[in-house]
Amino acid sequence: MVLNDKVYENISPQTLACWFMDDGGMNGSHSHGLQFRVSVILK
């Protein structure tokens, strides 16, 4: 998933955290999903 700057302006860190937690939970690997998604965005 690629988000542009305008999307980020309208999303709070709490919302992003919820997305990461939900995605990681659905994948059955919470911590790995969270770390992977954050690392992808920060690259």
UniProtKB/Swiss-Prot annotation:
The keyword Mitochondrion applies. Its EC number is 3.1.-.-. This is Probable intron-encoded DNA endonuclease 2. It is found in: Mitochondrion. It comes from Mycosarcoma maydis (Corn smut fungus). It comes from the Eukaryota. It is an enzyme of class 3 (hydrolase). SUPFAM superfamilies: Homing endonucleases (SSF55608). Keywords: Endonuclease, Hydrolase, Intron homing, Mitochondrion, Nuclease. One of its GO terms (biological process) is intron homing. Mitochondrial DNA endonuclease involved in intron homing. Belongs to the LAGLIDADG endonuclease family. GO terms for cellular component: mitochondrion. Encoded within intron 2 (LRI2) of mitochondrial large subunit ribosomal RNA. InterPro entries: Homing_endonucl, LAGLIDADG_dom. It holds the Pfam family LAGLIDADG_2. The lineage of its organism: Eukaryota, Fungi, Dikarya, Basidiomycota, Ustilaginomycotina. One of its GO terms (molecular function) is endonuclease activity.
